């Protein structure tokens, strides 16, 4: 089940990014006093009272040359589309503005839980000034100071009350996967081809997908799949669906819900920076990854074309050397019959458990081939290894000093483990731990 989502909305320069960073617990956005400067990440995760959740800062979604009020309106609509709970941020220093009233009207009609956070209430004397915000019709205003961290806990206490119930059980036998990629790489056509039906409206114009609906289906062998459709940008999407940060955000949410990610590239266009950014997030999240090169039927080929394209992918995605690459065409159905089987294989590899005796044989053989490094005269000693988790496979290696395990040596051990066992399509984690 996906994490509950909080969206932070409000006009520019009310302190949305400061509150976003406070909730996330780290300073991950660039924050200045000039309106409209939020850059970098607009989507992250947080935790409060034992509940994990996702956070969206809608102010980070650049809507280009749209008029000021239209931008604010559409950011509020994004929040309504994406969030379980909305935090509406206003400024206690400036009072209610026309832009605040516009956002309040949109949110009031949404039937989503809205928490009104009056920011920049930096001292107790200012608390008496927040009563005017009752006029927005959104219930009790919460006085907060993003810069000092005051009142944030009260806002989160209220947010958690509105989170959806997490008692829903998921079918462990169902493989959940998503197709992610830039607009116009052919995600919708691939979905239709995999399902064998015209479930999604498809055209050659970027951003024509109308909706995002998850789909269950079974293979001929009886394996259950849940396809998480990220192609859709909702009916309002024509305004902002090609906005890079918005589409990246949607991809991140899909990755969060998936076991396996199909990273779709356009054979005609090659690899773009956005592809690398989203693939990096899937890798860091520990998801299984398959690289799908679509529209292969449109490429002029010779005997080296596929090999050259694969070499380019390996060069651009060096950290995904474990991910299988498949060249397909949604139009001609080329190699599409191999996708479900490949997804099943990656799922099996994600769940693979290695007996400790076998694992330690491989690790000790690796040390014999390439002795452990030294640092300032002190040598790393490896005592034993054990697997502690799957999805992704995670190995704890007990050592004398954790700091002596350099990244390069951990990578060497990972490569030796991969040579010995089948982990195609899944990242694996190596965690050094000091033996007590």
From Swiss-Prot:
GO biological-process terms attached to the record: ribosome biogenesis
Protein name in the entry: GTPase Der
The protein's assembly and partners: Associates with the 50S ribosomal subunit.
Annotated binding of GTP 1, by residue: 10-17, 57-61, 119-122
Function according to Swiss-Prot or TrEMBL: GTPase that plays an essential role in the late steps of ribosome biogenesis.
Source organism: Enterococcus faecalis (strain ATCC 700802 / V583)
Gene3D superfamilies: 3.30.300.20, P-loop containing nucleotide triphosphate hydrolases
Keywords: GTP-binding, Nucleotide-binding, Repeat, Ribosome biogenesis
Family: Belongs to the TRAFAC class TrmE-Era-EngA-EngB-Septin-like GTPase superfamily. EngA (Der) GTPase family.
Binding site for GTP 2: 181-188, 229-233, 294-297
Pfam families noted in UniProt: KH_dom-like, MMR_HSR1
Stored CDD domains: EngA1, EngA2
Domain EngA-type G per the UniProt entry, residue ranges: 4-167, 175-351
Segments forming domain KH-like: 352-436
MF GO annotations: GTP binding; ribosome binding
């Amino acid at each position: 089940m996906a994490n509950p989502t909080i969206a932070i909305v409000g006009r520019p320069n009310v302190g949305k990014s400061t509150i976003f960073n406070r909730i996330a617990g780290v300073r991950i956005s660039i924050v200045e006093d000039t309106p409209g400067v939020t850059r970098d990440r607009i989507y992250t995760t947080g935790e409060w009272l034992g509940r994990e959740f996702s956070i969206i800062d809608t102010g980070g979604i650049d809507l280009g040359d749209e008029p000021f009020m239209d931008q604010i309106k559409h950011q509020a609509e994004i929040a309504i589309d994406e969030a379980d709970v909305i935090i509406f941020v206003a400024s206690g220093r400036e009072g209610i503005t026309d832009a605040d009233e516009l956002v309040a009207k949109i949110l009031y009609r949404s039937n989503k839980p809205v928490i009104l956070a009056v920011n920049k209430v930096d001292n107790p004397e200012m608390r008496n000034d927040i009563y005017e915000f009752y006029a927005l019709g959104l219930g009790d205003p919460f006085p907060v100071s993003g810069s000092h961290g005051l009142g944030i806990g009260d806002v989160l206490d209220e947010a958690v009350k509105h989170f959806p119930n997490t008692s829903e059980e998921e079918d462990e036998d169902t493989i959940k996967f998503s197709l992610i990629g830039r607009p116009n790489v052919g995600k919708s056509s691939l979905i239709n081809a995999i399902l064998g039906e015209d479930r999604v409206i498809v055209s050659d114009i970027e951003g024509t997908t109308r909706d995002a609906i998850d789909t269950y289906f079974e293979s001929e062998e009886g394996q259950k799949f849940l396809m998480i459709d990220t192609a859709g940008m909702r009916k309002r999407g024509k305004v902002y669906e090609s906005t890079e940060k918005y589409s990246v955000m949607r991809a991140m949410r899909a990755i969060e819900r998936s076991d396996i990610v199909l990273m779709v590239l356009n054979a005609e266009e090659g690899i773009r920076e956005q592809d690398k950014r989203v693939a990096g997030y899937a890798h860091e999240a520990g998801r299984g990854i398959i690289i799908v090169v679509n529209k292969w039927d449109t490429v002029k080929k010779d005997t080296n074309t596929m090999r050259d394209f694969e070499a380019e992918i390996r060069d651009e995605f060096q950290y995904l050397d474990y991910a299988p690459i498949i060249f397909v065409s949604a139009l001609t159905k080329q190699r599409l019959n191999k996708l479900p089987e490949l997804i099943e294989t990656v799922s099996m590899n994600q769940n693979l458990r290695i007996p400790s005796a076998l694992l330690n044989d491989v690790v000790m053989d690796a040390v014999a081939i390439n002795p452990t490094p030294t640092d300032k005269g002190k040598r790393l000693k490896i005592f034993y290894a054990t697997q502690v988790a799957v999805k992704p496979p995670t190995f704890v290696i007990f050592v004398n000093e954790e700091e002596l395990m350099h990244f390069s040596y951990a990578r060497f051990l990972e490569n030796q483990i991969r040579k010995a066992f089948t982990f195609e399509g899944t990242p694996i984690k190596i965690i050094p731990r000091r033996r007590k």
